[in-house]
Every structure is written in C-alpha cells, then in structure tokens.
C-alpha cells in the first residue's frame, strides 16, 4: 500500500524554497526532507507528498505557497494596508509641499492650485487629489535620514540602521508587510497576507529578513501563471491528491518520531486551500471585474495594479505593496535631471508621472470608500526620501538630488482622522520646521492600525530580541 501511495507522488524538479540562494534549481522535490524507512520503502513527509502533488501547477510549489500565509493564522479583523511605493523618492516641493514664493531654482517649474482644505495648495498636476484632499492627510515633515535606494529601505522597515552600504545586517531587517504577515496574518485563509505588485526590482520592496523567507512578499506579477492548472490535471484530480496526502497521515504517524509532521499539516492545508479554493485565483483575475470598473481605473499599468490591490484586500490580503515604477534600478521617481536617463528631471521626468498618479490614487480611494472598505484599509503613498530644495544637481539644470532631511507623503483611510496637514518644512523645503515624523512613527501607526502590539519582537541571527518599533509612536494627529 505504501508503495502504491508513493508511486503517485511523482518526482519533479523545482526551485529552492530559499530564493535568496542559488544553485539548487535542479534539487529533487524529495530532497528537502529527511526520509524515514519502513519495509525497505523510502517514506517522505506529508509536506513532501503534497509538494510533489502540487508542483505541476505552473511552478506553484509548496514553498511558494507557504509564504502566502502566516503560520496558518487568519486575522479576526479585516484591517489591511495598501502601500503605493513611489520608487526613487518624489520631490516634496513639486508635489505636496510647494514653495510658490521662492525663486524658480527652488520652487521649480510647476504652478500650484488650491485644495479642498482652506489655505492648502499642492502641485497643479494633482487636481483630482486637490478636489478631495479632505479624504487625505499630508505629512510635510518626515525625517528619513539614513534612507537610500537599497533593499529593505529605512522607509519600509523603520530601522535607521538599514543602510546596506555600511551595515551588512541591513538586508535582514523585516519589512512592514512581513511583520504584518507574521503577526496579523491574512484576513481569509485562502489569501496571501503580503503581496507585491508590479515589482520591477527586488530592491524596491521589503522582505522577511530575520523572520524568514516564508514572510517574503508573494510576487503578484506571476500570479496568473501560478494559479493555472496544467493540461491533464483537473480540480478533481487535485482533490484526489489531497485525499492521498490525508491517507498518508496514518503511515507517517507510525514512522515519524520527530514531531515535525504535526507542524507540516498547516503547510499542506494552506497549499490546498489556496489552489483548490479558487479565491486567490479569482482575486488576481481582473477580467472578472465589471468592464465599467476597469474603464474607471483605466489601462495604465499602475491603474491596473491599484484595481488589483483593491480586489486583494477586499478578498482577504492584509498588506499589498504596489511598486509605482516603470524601471528597475533606483526607480521612476528618481528625477536627477534630463541628462541622467532614464528618469529625467522635474519637467520631463516627474511631470508625466503626476497626472497618472493623481488619477490612480483618487480612483482607488473613491472606490474603496464606495465599497465600504476605506475605514479598514490604510492607504500610504511615499518613497525613500525627499529631494534637494534647489534645482540643478549633478550637472543638470532641471533635476533634484536625494534629500533625506525632509520628505512629504500622504495617507488616506484606515479609520483615521483626515483632512489635515501634519508638520511643516522651512521656507525652502529643505529642513523640518515643525512636528518631525519619523519612520518609527509611521511603523507604529501601521501596526496600531493592524492590531500588532508595539512591544512585539523578532529574533536576529544571534538570538537577540529586537522590537518591531525601536523608536516611535502612532501619529497622534491621526488618532
């Protein structure tokens, strides 16, 4: 009987579950587990059996699947976060903190427009946001010193030591999304908790780090392929394989004395729930959205990703990051100057982005509100840092360099108090003038929203506990 059961778990080749490593692309599926022997038959764990059973699903292996949920945990609340990551670092002066009274080399080429908040002006290329700014909070005093274009940036981890150029441990600091995945989990057992969309480079998003690769984000770029059943594998056959794995329970109880199998049960059920349940597959399928809704968002890639993010949180994902970039490397918003391709300067580089962003963010907020999702969904728009208060850096006449001393960002939703501006920069937009907001404050606000206790810790490679928020508190003006 054992031989018959195991003969159905056909051998395959698959990628290593630790995608930070290389050189294991041809590892046998059963090689991940230590076998036990019974009557001369090699008997593998239930996890191995299900791994082989599901491995034909367009590359949707069990290691990939088990990254989608947090220890089998499903959150009791429906809270979620959508992070629109403006990769490269948008200019504060040319977006949400204009300086119209200053010389052109400071104020830049754009005009300003009034908003729904009396006395508050923003860039002329954000008219839709200006008209509904009462739904947003602008923060004009974010202190993002130490941040740079690197994996697990300071602004996605809230760890001020997160500078890989000087700190080799920086890549291990877990991101907001990974911590939410571990300590909040998904809002539905068949949905991944932490998803990244439109990822142009690994350096644009935050990873699991010390938490482990199981808390890395699920790459939504590949979702359409991952959830396709290959020819010859029907849902009935997949369900039969699930029954097979359950039949293996009795056998493995006799031969596995390590206790590992009990822990693996949740991995197996997670994999089957996500594939066979159909909920995740349906969530990633934009063709199921009414045409009028798709038309409302539009055909731009960022708009499609925003619609997809709404579908994901609506169906149970708890943290979705959209990489708002058209490029790899440092990112689309890295507007150093027209003579520094491919990003351009403020006029030729930033200006075309703003109307697209304006449409995407306002459509998303309106749609979430109309569906009753906005109070449970915190939407955050930000990049790594601000940009220099003076035009003409690095030999250009129309670009701005990195400037971590002050940054602007915006938030909406989450049941917080909006229709306000928090903090202020100085007259040139180069320094914080009042109410500094730190990455730790932002992290504490996210975890407060998601119900993750601020005294939660994770363990580093030396076995030492580290607080998820070392310095910071929820932004009081929002609460």
Language-model features, listed with the residues they occupy:
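Ligand-binding pockets and gating/stacking loops
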Residues: 2-479
